[in-house]
Amino acid sequence: MTQQPQADAPLAGRHIAVLLGGPSSERKVSLVSGAACAEALERLGAKVSRIDPGPDVAQVLAATKPDMVFNALHGEWGEDGCVQGVLETLKLPYTHSGVLASALAMDKAKAKAVLAAAGVTVPGGGLFNRHDVARDHVLQPPYVVKPNAEGSSVGVFIIKEGANRPPEEVGAPSWTFGEEVMVEPYIQGMELAVAVLGESNGPRALAVTDIRASTGFYDYEAKYSEGGSIHVLPAPIPNAVRDRAMRMAELAHTALGCRGVTRSDFRYDDINDLLVLLEVNTQPGMTPTSLAPEQADHVGIPFDQLVLWIVEDAYARCSAGGTA
């Protein structure tokens, strides 16, 4: 449903294509994010074309002729540098991170190497062949097994302390997340998240959220099912830990070369005062109740204003001489 524009309509006269859906395992989440952003853009006065991209996305965009693209895709192809490369080829301004940062952040092993070199604390472990992981414990339990290039906690297994068997599902023919998997020691404690805005004078961390999953693990269902998790904002942590998480998120945003909005996910072991950055999301969820918009609202940036900032940030980069 087309939204009525605001009286001031700051995006009046703009034609913005919103990419939503796509082919990844996070399609459903992207459809919700994209719908919310498209409605906000219409309230801001823009003409909006909603595009659920397929193999012909370049031709569709060329025929649609938007002024810019709002990328609301999540996961494979939309968040890993692929669609960003298409948009660069078409010379279309687009939101969020560019080709290199998107590809780096999606590849957990490469991202960890870059972040560690920049001084960010990341988990140990590494990449293993999935069949080796399925046959025997490659680390002493407890540990975590996850795809090297997926988001939304898709395909993640936690092997608890004292577990007798490894995650045999990883070696099954039905496994579709690549031949190598990331295996890391399990870090006890709190699940924290920090959203960052890549402002012109440097990245700005917004707040720290404590995420409490009803099942004890913040998996896909906990993230997107009603009642699956509780977001405690601000997180009930010492000020020094809050500041450390925010600075670490800003450093990660810069080290990976990210732009626009990102969200860094952490584990905090309060017993040992260990704060570890798990991953950086270059296309964080953008429903009004997602973590990044929640934090923006917490610091005085309502959802529509956050969407406007994302668009204006992309336009500013374009006018400064880059596609995005």
Swiss-Prot record:
GO terms for cellular component: cytoplasm. It is an enzyme of class 6 (ligase). It comes from the Bacteria. GO terms for molecular function: ATP binding; D-alanine-D-alanine ligase activity; metal ion binding. Its EC number is 6.3.2.4. It catalyses: 2 D-alanine + ATP = D-alanyl-D-alanine + ADP + phosphate + H(+). Keywords: ATP-binding, Cell shape, Cell wall biogenesis/degradation, Cytoplasm, Ligase, Magnesium, Manganese, Metal-binding, Nucleotide-binding, Peptidoglycan synthesis. Pathway: Cell wall biogenesis; peptidoglycan biosynthesis. Pfam families: Dala_Dala_lig_C, Dala_Dala_lig_N. The keyword Glycosyltransferase does not apply. It is found in: Cytoplasm. Binds 2 magnesium or manganese ions per subunit. Mg(2+) 1 binds at residues 265, 279. Its main location: cytoplasm. Its cofactor is Mg(2+); Mn(2+). Residues 112-312 form the ATP-grasp domain. ATP binds at residues 139-193. The keyword Manganese applies. One of its GO terms (biological process) is regulation of cell shape. Belongs to the D-alanine--D-alanine ligase family. PANTHER family: D-ALANINE--D-ALANINE LIGASE (PTHR23132), D-ALANINE--D-ALANINE LIGASE B (PTHR23132:SF23). Cell wall formation. This is D-alanine--D-alanine ligase. The gene is ddl.
